[in-house]
């Protein structure tokens, strides 16, 4: 990317357009639409060319939805991505930790709301950048609980039934007794279900696929994230390291700033962990151009909204 293109990116970030595509005006809702369903896509060619420029998707790997589509209908080899999720740290192929999360819950990408993607990205940064370990499933279970998001719907007899939301039906919440860098995110991301597009799948290392084939099945009820006694003993050194990170004053904002400051997609498979990061020429970066602190702060503000978040220690 040229300096001129980077300047344009920074200008768009300041206006909040590049960082918050999910907040665009939505068309009339489709007949029969219920809370959590997909919305007709509002993604444009310009949006996807911008992702290509920034290295977040591969050149000529994407396809816009067909006119009149109200929900995704992917072709062979395609997967359904969302701008809201790409801007919060997901790109193909998925990081082994994130793929493990998806396999554990039998989940699709759209089952996770944008805030869940932001929390997962922050967790990967916490582990690789601040603790110095690969993202650890046991530590994740120590910190977070999983929860299902349900909606009420009238059946044919007029009785109310509960359904898990198709989009955003699976989220995560910090356990009350767990130590974790403070991070408050926007309560909701308006119209994020309209930010979908198609992208050719990219296989994970030593695998034949990246994301699972797209499905419109609703998520399964969230499984409990409980630790066994053996797991509690095994992760205690990591818990101690986490407590020390929090004691030093590291916040969730610090974690998010790594994502854009280093231009790394934490939920994308990489050839090395973040503790081996070497600078602007590092192979894990989506782009070698560095962004200003003002641009990074603007992006973080789009993710956190009006929520008050503590500031981390000065460097």
Where are these regions (language model features)?
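Residue-register detector that marks a fixed positional context within folded domains
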Residues: 1-315
